[in-house]
Amino acid sequence: MIIKNALVYTPDHTFVPGDLAIRDGRIAADTTPQPGEEVIDAGGLYALPGLLDIHFHGAVGHDFCDGTEEAIQALADFEASKGILAICPATMTYSEEILNGVMDAAAAHKNGRGADLVGINMEGPFISPHKLGAQNPAYLHLPDVAMFRRLQKRSGGLIKLVDIAPEEECAFDFIAQCKDEVRISIAHTCTSYDTAIAAFDLGASHMTHLYNAMPGITHREPGPIIAALERKAEVELITDGVHIHPAMVRFTFRTFGDDRVILIADSMMACGLPDGEYSLGGQAVTVKGPRATLTEQPGVIAGSATCLYDCMKRAVLDMGVALESAVRAASENPARSIGVDADYGSLAVGRYGNVILADKALEIQSVIQKGVRIV
């Protein structure tokens, strides 16, 4: 396949008028059309790399923690239709027994149709009881190396991220023992600046949904956010227009840099569906517009109802983030953060030929997966 006359997002994070070639499913250097080769005239559309969401829970009525092939395939199909061509869905805080079923289903899944399943983000249960967000307190568990390793074995090595509250008992031991086995993210935490610094120095390298479910910044208690800034951690941002004020989104891109920000959806099963009553982690959720909240605690946000592509689009059109930065934060950065950037996250030669063609309003005109047009 040849894509002609596009504004191509290059590995240098700039847009350049040009052509793309996809052969044997991967980006090729020679853009000269071969006899009989499919040629698409992009007519000046943006050519963006396929996105990668490393933190979302569900969509279109399904949740990753359903622990079924039906759910995984439904999520893969929906995400791909939105230009998200690789996924690393997140678990919720559940018992090991329930998580076993999720890991078994993920391990059995075969990539083919829809977004590629490239990892699992284990968001619970090693978190603080005081910063639960929409996590279920009934299933909280202290950080447990043996439990993690059992789950990782069942998943076939798919767990790429484990979330942890570093102030909890056993957390430092977990970080020290597991830092070379999985990426460790600080999340759902009451941690102080000093404890967060110590956790990063031990081997944590990531921060889950920055600003949400953690202490804020003050001049006497700088907290984990400043620790993440100083220790060069990668940080997730939910740019759905509900979780974070646009000024804070711009602030984060300026201070952390667009090489360290990772856009995520953190979406739940209502994403792609009308307003109504849903569930997340065994708790009732009410969705109205882009806002999802616990039904019994309307002040508690319960994930988002927005997919990653629309979060990226909103960051650009509504929040003042440069398109080049937002694309990087939704493609290259998440791919690198979970170690799959040799195949995903950019339009460099040798990467999978995953391309989104979008107009100047960032409306998707076509989605191409490994050289096959799927939208």
Question: What feature does the model see in each segment?
Answer:
Residues 57, 73-102, 115-128, 155-167, ...:
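Divalent metal-dependent hydrolysis catalytic cores, especially in the metallo-beta-lactamase
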Residues 152-274:
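Active-site core of metal-dependent hydrolases
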Residues 6, 336, 346-375:
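C-terminal cap of metal-dependent C-N hydrolases
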Residues 1-48:
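Histidine-rich, glycine-flanked metal-binding segment
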Residues 46, 54, 64-116, 138-154, ...:
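Alpha-helical scaffold segments that flank or form the walls of functional sites
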Residues 224-236, 253-265, 271-351, 355-357:
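His/Asp/Glu-enriched, well-ordered alpha-helical/loop segment
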Residues 44, 122, 178, 207, ...:
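Conserved, mostly hydrophobic/aromatic
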Residues 77-88, 128-156, 200-210, 221-234, ...:
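Active-site gating loops and adjacent loop-to-helix segments of metal-dependent hydrolytic enzymes
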